[in-house]
């Protein structure tokens, strides 16, 4: 059995025998599923990016309806969702990135840009195409897993590399819409702090 799957984590075995997705280092996870395999993830209350590299999955969270997502797409699962369930409709490769509850480039966006690009009602699983630089980046992550490289500090640096790549190779509108759950939460937090300390 793969060492990643044997490793203890905050996840627990599902009673219905669906495949439980391991979270080896709490930053990146990688797994392959055969077609028609059910799976579930009990994740931390942080934002996660799911990358569908190959295949097709039907996915749902505690706060949304089922949606089919295809290969070479990525999407954000917000921190309000603690459980993700799905079915692999084809043989599927998935990478998960625990992105945390803040993004370093939030300050680069004006309030006007955020209001014009964000939806009032954020669509769960609004997919974004995985472009070639991100695909190459993910291939490197997969190689680390295949060779059992599990340095948490390195994966932390790779997380920031992903944030750099998405800024470099995607339009500002795409980036804001993709990260809108995080940006909105950070904006609300900033308002609360400002109101408390300016009275």
Residue ranges of model-derived segments:
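A short, Lys/Arg-enriched amphipathic alpha-helix from helix-turn-helix/homeodomain DNA-binding modules
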Residues: 131-142, 155-159, 167, 176-199
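N-terminal regulatory/effector-sensing and dimerization cores
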Residues: 20-118
